[in-house]
Regions:
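Extracellular glycan-interacting surfaces
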Residues: 4-7, 12, 16-391
Length: 391
């Protein structure tokens, strides 16, 4: 089921966890250890790359739970993993691990819950985000769409009331996957600045630590609405922040790919050169400014890879041009859709790029996306992937 191959220099024999052996598998010497967390419809799978070889733990964590959100928090002396699981019997919860996913803890009281006066109940956790400028702060995005803040590294969370009580909330509507707050971006320069995205309400920003919020969607189209350019109501699928310029953001919309150069106040369409502008995922290169990745999907009514080819597209110049990245990826009759949190980068140099799809396949690149290897197949639907250097 799970492969452990990686392209590079030289040849080696690799024994898979299932017992089979591949001859003449390319070997690469990698000094850093990378942890990969793959959240699926039926559990969390964890892989590690050591010395150029990937190995995956036997079986999933949180068996039969949908894991929509994962975070790898490397800010402290010991990395902490956070996972948002959703049990059909016990309901949703947030778990944490301080030993790279070997063992997990769940708080005695629910980490994320809606206060009684809201009249709401937690459906799932869509996002877990360690804050860029506050070492112990973690944000959670949920369904129904709400933002929560933790000051103890994700063990307990408090509802950010001003966003929950925003005057536009009564006009927010669920997207196809539900009404979820799926993106949280913090600013290393200013802990008071937070950007979130909601499907279907659009982008909202605060510059005063969450006391007030404003829609931030100027230039982003909502072609499905009577007014195609509303203040809010856009079906934003994902937003990522540039590595060099914190005010530069990349946005994958229901239709359209956009860039902002002023922290989201205004957006410019950068979709020219892509085979399709529909898609779910966008990720930024961890070190190289102006570089971002998307995975184009044919259309909202035809949710398969553009031209039925498995290709990540990369821009090296903030959206002025796009290049397809397909070396090592299947190119014939491919139907694996990549969801909004199933594309990510690590913080290695060169950068690792990763994605998983609804076919249960996981692919990785160790060279900024130039070449790819398949790490896993036959998993449940991949909902999210996260990777980080941990050693």
């Amino acid at each position: 089921m799970v492969g452990c191959r990686l392209g590079g220099i030289g040849k080696c024999r690799v024994r898979h966890r299932c017992g089979t052996v591949d001859d003449e598998v390319p070997e690469v010497v990698v000094m850093t250890e990378v942890l990969l967390a793959v959240g699926t419809r039926k559990g969390l799978f964890i892989g590690r790359r050591r010395g150029g070889t990937w190995e995956f733990d036997d079986g999933p964590r949180f068996n039969a739970q949908a894991v929509h959100a994962v975070a790898i928090d490397t800010r402290g002396d010991t990395p902490r993993l956070l996972a948002g699981g959703d049990s059909s019997h016990w309901g949703p919860s947030v778990f944490h691990s301080d030993d790279l996913g070997r063992t997990w803890s769940e708080p005695a009281q629910p980490a994320v819950k809606f206060p009684m006066d809201t009249g709401a109940s937690l459906e799932r956790v869509w996002q877990l985000h360690p804050a860029a400028a506050e070492p112990d702060v973690v944000y959670a995005g949920t369904e129904p769409a709400a933002l929560y803040r933790s000051e103890d590294r994700g063990e307990s969370f408090t509802l950010v009331r001003p966003l929950w009580e925003h005057p536009t909330r009564s006009r927010w509507v669920p997207g196809g996957g539900g009404e979820g707050l799926h993106t949280v971006l913090t600013d290393a320069r200013d802990p008071r600045a937070v950007t979130v995205a909601v499907s279907t309400a659009g982008v909202f920003r605060t510059t005063d630590g969450g006391e007030s919020w404003a829609p931030s969607n100027s230039g982003v189209s909502a072609a499905f609405l009577p007014d195609p350019d509303p203040e809010f109501g856009q079906c934003v699928h994902k937003v990522a922040r540039d590595a060099d310029d914190p005010d530069r953001l990349y946005l994958q919309n229901h239709w359209g790919v956009y860039r902002s150069d002023d922290a989201g106040a205004h957006w410019t369409d950068i979709g020219e050169g892509l085979p399709a502008t529909f898609g779910f995922a966008v990720a930024a290169h961890p070190h190289r400014g102006g570089t971002a990745y998307v995975f184009p999907i044919n259309a909202d009514s035809d949710r398969v890879p553009a031209d039925h080819r498995c290709r990540v597209f990369r821009t090296p110049d903030a959206g002025k041009s796009w290049e397809p990245l397909s070396q090592g990826l299947p190119q014939d009759d491919h139907y694996g859709t990549v969801l909004r949190d199933a594309l990510c980068t690590d913080d290695a140099e060169p950068a690792g790029v990763y994605f998983g799809n609804r076919n249960g396949e996981v692919f990785a690149s160790a060279d900024d996306g130039d070449t790819w290897e398949q790490l896993a197949s036959h998993l449940p639907d991949v909902l999210c992937v996260r990777a980080a250097v941990v050693g």
